[in-house]
Each structure stands twice: as C-alpha cells, then as structure tokens.
Amino acid sequence: MPKHHQKAQSPGGSQRQLRVGEIVRHAVAELLSQGGVHDPVLEGHLITVPEVRMSPDLKLATVYVMPLGGRDTDVVLKALAANKPFIRTAVARRVNLKFAPDLRFRIDERFDEAERIEKLLRTPGVQKDLQQDSDET
C-alpha cells in the first residue's frame, strides 16, 4: 500500500492559499482606498494592506493592515471590526470563491520590527562588532 506524503508548505501556506490571499488582499485594499466603507474613522486614514493569510480551507482570512504613519492603530482596528460584515460582503462580491471568508483584522507589525532592528544595528556596540568582523575577513 503506497504511503501518502504531505507536501512541504511554504510559511505562507500552499500556492492556492497564497493566490487567494493575494486576491482578497487586493479586494480589501481597493475597497478601503476608494472609500467604499462609509465610516468616518476609516475615511480619515490611509490604510495599507500588505498581506492576507488564508486558512487551509480558505474560510478564514487574516488581513494585516497598517494605517499610514502607524498612528491610531487601535481605533482603526475597532472601526474595521465594526464594519467587518459590510467589508466581508463587499469582498465576496469582488472575489469568486465558494465561501466568503471570515475576516480577521490584525496590525502588521513587520515595519516596527524592521525599524527596531535598524536601530539596533546602528548602536555603537553592534557597529563595533560588525567592524571587527569585517576586519577579520
């Protein structure tokens, strides 16, 4: 009897998850950028949508967002959560899927993490270590 091997998946999921996530990301970003959600908080912020991660069954989409400038993240998350039913319906109309995915909104903290690493790399102690490493090679 042959053994079934699971395919190794990339950190973001299968090709299908990545493809559907990108389609959902585009739909949400377009909706937010064109003022499709009539909410004063959301209309007052430019919101980027750098990534959407889909569950393996494609029924759950984790939407990573970041208000431009990184301000008012809690307020923006609350406004997105309050408008989730409308956003989900609007995305379902734009995306041809068997099920409209449930949306979870999260703040994308990669920018903050990258900035923290940049600051760390510029500290005198790290600069000294990097200089010593380059002198040895």
Swiss-Prot record:
Instruction: Kindly list the GO molecular function terms attached to this UniProt entry.
Output: ribosomal small subunit binding
- Key word Cytoplasm present: yes
Keywords from UniProt, A to Z, are: Cytoplasm, Ribosome biogenesis
Cell location = Cytoplasm
What Pfam families does this protein map onto? RBFA
* Signal peptide range in chain numbering: none
List the residue ranges forming a coiled coil, or say none: none
Q: Which InterPro entries match?
A: KH_dom-like_a/b (IPR015946), RbfA (IPR000238), RbfA_dom_sf (IPR023799), Ribosome-bd_factorA_CS (IPR020053)
Say where the protein is mainly found: cytoplasm
A biological process term (GO) from this entry: maturation of SSU-rRNA
One GO cellular component this record assigns the protein to is: cytosol
Q: Which family does it belong to?
A: Belongs to the RbfA family.
User: What is known about its subunit structure?
Assistant: Monomer. Binds 30S ribosomal subunits, but not 50S ribosomal subunits or 70S ribosomes.
Q: What does this protein do?
A: One of several proteins that assist in the late maturation steps of the functional core of the 30S ribosomal subunit. Associates with free 30S ribosomal subunits (but not with 30S subunits that are part of 70S ribosomes or polysomes). Required for efficient processing of 16S rRNA. May interact with the 5'-terminal helix region of 16S rRNA.
What this protein is called in its record is Ribosome-binding factor A
Q: Which organism is this entry from?
A: Rhodopseudomonas palustris (strain BisB18)
Q: What is the lineage of its organism?
A: Bacteria, Pseudomonadati, Pseudomonadota, Alphaproteobacteria, Hyphomicrobiales
